[in-house]
């Protein structure tokens, strides 16, 4: 079993003490996010956990516990989101300069192969256009590529509640700017930056990039999309059993996570977070 901590909330940033308490107990009770009255017990005992995948904006509160996690024998890697957007969109996330520092420290402790940078979501607004993303991504790649092995990019999904929240703040999403053609062009620029920076680049659950891809297993990018021989960025897995096998000598077989979106290629995992308790305050977040 892979434990995801967590798509729903930033456990490393805000609930690392809570996580460690339950890790020591060897068990956690997780509520169904859609039916809170339904609960299930999830074992966190070493013999039941193949690995942890930590999702975060700020790993620093958990970093002081990494020695204990490693002594207990748990494999893990980090997915760390850094977008560098204006504070109106993400008022309480770490500054870019802070992110570069903790990336460097964490890479020095566990190696860059266990650090994955997420540039997610790619959003278009009146003040955040194509050229902003090209320059922003390039600057972030220059800062973070010495300390990360891979970057995962994903475009903004216009959930109604999120669009309402953005509009209330006076921010209109530029949907035309986020067209499939624009996405493909932008990803080509991202791919060139990633190649120069020594970063592997993947997309996350993007219909424009995974049409024709076999979803029952990890596949190569499709051919003939958007007038290109193949898209500039292929589909990837945030929860990646192949990476875990490579890093830790595991023997995990691929099984698509049935609880995720159709186009998501992630390995099946158990998420131990809950919605509505992240304190970063990002206006575009679907988990608020």
Give the ranges of each region predicted by the language model.
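A structural motif corresponding to the C-terminal lobe/cap of the Radical SAM core domain
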Residues: 170-186
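Flexible glycine/acidic-rich beta-alpha junction loops that bind and position SAM and/or redox cofactors
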Residues: 90, 123-127, 150-175, 205-217, ...
